[in-house]
């Protein structure tokens, strides 16, 4: 699961989207709560209607100054624990970078991740890059089938010059090359009642936040 933190679009008169990319992997601290967290991801209302506000996805690492508060508080200001640069501007450690919205600013979301590896799909070994997908941005009671969406395409020598005849170690651009079937797999989600699996390989099934089916690659 991810901890979701909704922030206001502006801070000190600056549009926070101009530096949100630089915040990935950086630590932040709540000015009033003292809670410390690391930013793993950021999503925007432009990413889809499910995102109501600019949302930071964080992992909390330190509880508050009273050792009781474990998450940021509504409306509080966030302080940068690292240093970032965007354009010609530097925000140093100890400076403020954002403020939480005034109500219902924090929640727990659900996420599924897959590590880098090789899957055997349709008779072919397919390399899969490390990736994650947020199932629901503000709740951890999600219900989905999660797996890999498969894209098959024919790649010709015109698309990939490495497919031209390279006898004796030299590319012969006058000789036709062999076309190849390219399979790409992307982590994706489907509703539980969507059983159209022509281009989908299910890996895990989640119902109301609980794992019901887990398939090994």
Predicted regions and their residues:
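Subunit-assembly interface segments of extracellular/virion macromolecular structures
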Residues: 1-217
């Amino acid at each position: 699961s991810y901890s979701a933190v909704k922030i206001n679009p502006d801070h000190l008169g600056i549009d926070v989207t101009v530096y949100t990319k630089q915040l990935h992997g950086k630590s932040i601290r709540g000015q009033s709560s003292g809670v410390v967290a690391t930013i793993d991801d950021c999503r925007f209302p432009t990413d889809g209607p499910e995102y109501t506000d600019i949302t930071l996805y964080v992992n909390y690492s330190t509880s508050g100054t009273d050792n009781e508060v474990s998450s940021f508080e509504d409306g509080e200001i966030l302080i940068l624990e690292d240093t970032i640069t965007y354009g010609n501007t530097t925000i140093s450690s100890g400076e403020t970078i954002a403020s939480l919205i005034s109500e219902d600013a924090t929640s727990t979301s659900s996420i599924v991740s897959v590590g880098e590896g090789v899957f055997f799909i349709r008779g072919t070994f397919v390399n899969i890059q490390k990736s994650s997908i947020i199932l629901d941005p503000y709740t951890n009671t999600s219900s989905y089938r999660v797996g890999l969406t498969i894209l098959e395409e024919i790649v010709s020598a015109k698309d990939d010059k490495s497919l031209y005849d390279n006898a004796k170690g030299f590319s012969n651009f006058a000789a036709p090359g062999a076309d190849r079937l390219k399979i790409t797999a992307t982590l994706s989600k489907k509703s539980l009642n969507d059983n159209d699996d022509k281009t989908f390989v299910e890996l895990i099934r989640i119902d109301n936040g609980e794992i019901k089916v887990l398939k090994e690659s």
